From Swiss-Prot:
The keyword Amino-acid biosynthesis applies. The keyword ATP-binding does not apply. HAMAP family: Arg_succ_lyase (MF_00006). NCBIfam families: argH (TIGR00838). This is Argininosuccinate lyase.
Amino acid sequence: MTKQKTWSDRFEGSLHPAIVEFNASIGFDIELIEYDLTGSIAHAQMLAHTGIISPEEAQKLTQGLEQIRQEYRQGEFKPGIDQEDVHFAVERRLTEIVGDVGKKLHTARSRNDQVGTDIRLYLRDQISQIRAQLREFQQVLVNHAENHIETLIPGYTHLQRAQPISLAHHLLAYFQMAQRDWERLGEIYARTNISPLGCGALAGTTFPIDRHYSAELLQFQGVYGNSLDGVSDRDFAIEFLNAASLIMVHLSRLSEEMILWSSHEFSFISLTDSCATGSSIMPQKKNPDVPELVRGKAGRVFGHLQGMLVLMKGLPLAYNKDLQEDKEAIFDGVKTVKVCLEAMTILLAEGIKFREERLAEAVSEDFSNATDVADYLAAKGIPFREAYNLVGKVVKTSSAAGKLLKDLSLEEWQALHPAFEADIYDAIAPKQVVAARNSYGGTGFEQIRQAITRAKAQLESS
């Protein structure tokens, strides 16, 4: 049996060893130790600032906490499950280092506001890192876009060829998704960057603390105005996991396209040896493991979001032990997004080569220029719906004859409608089809150049 003397001498009995292990979170919340130490240093300095402890005591506490930081970084501080959690582990080690003054650190503080502070410090840091990764990802997309403004690729709806577009246009669509992700995380950062320190267990404290002072030391932008809300709020974590899920949605969609494009059936890209694997039995295989793993890992992040929503939905105010379960969801969500962003950035930068000859063939061997025939007739005064129906018949007739639109003779065109002239061939040429779509945000080459300029400005603004 294990006696948990850290709580209070109210307990005479001891916890069953299995319950000790079940109750302990030190196995995963050790991830917060650097943030716990930083928060504790700020708390100690606030206690001295308000006269609750002496400056000398605060200095001893700060020195002891920094010693623990060094011990942890050097692999010397390895608390076991008997320590229950990172907060008790730090406090016990601190008391060993500085003596009884270490027991004063927890004055005017509860583990409830302490862990809330730690998680916010951690997530604030991780959000900044993920935003930086998104910028690297976006930069690679822009680099490819600059090189492929006039490289054409089939555009799809329903996974059926629809209209030819610029490859750069396709890549910049993912830039825009990542831009929304970057902006969304910035908004979540602001709501995460609020201090619960000083809220106590749930009702505040009788000590004359200065919550704004400790918040300023920790570079929080403000403090919670309600102590119950401060210790029980996990909205910011749910918002983060929602944003993380959207990042994974976007990466998974791109992954699916990389998988399709690398297949023999598409052959739009080839995978380099640095980002592909082989088969244990089929020597000809080159497998797109990176995008497949990213696509698969999206599910675990979605699961963490759902888990957090279910975790929070029935909790009465204020703190409940259920909230111990928030950390692994947050930690794994962070790590999964970061590793997937890194892998996809490497894949795009080093792992793929666009097969431009194959892409050129792909946009020339179908009827994806049919809309432009209808537009051609509409520009000559024929109602679009009438033109649309006529072109549908043209496609049906041409397909039955084994011909593409470009293969029809002028006589055949004019037999269909006298409005057709020799310039129809220019109008349906793939590059002209793409260049003509010059509306704002469209795939026209001039629009793409402007979009790249805007994208670069967004990258430089951060």
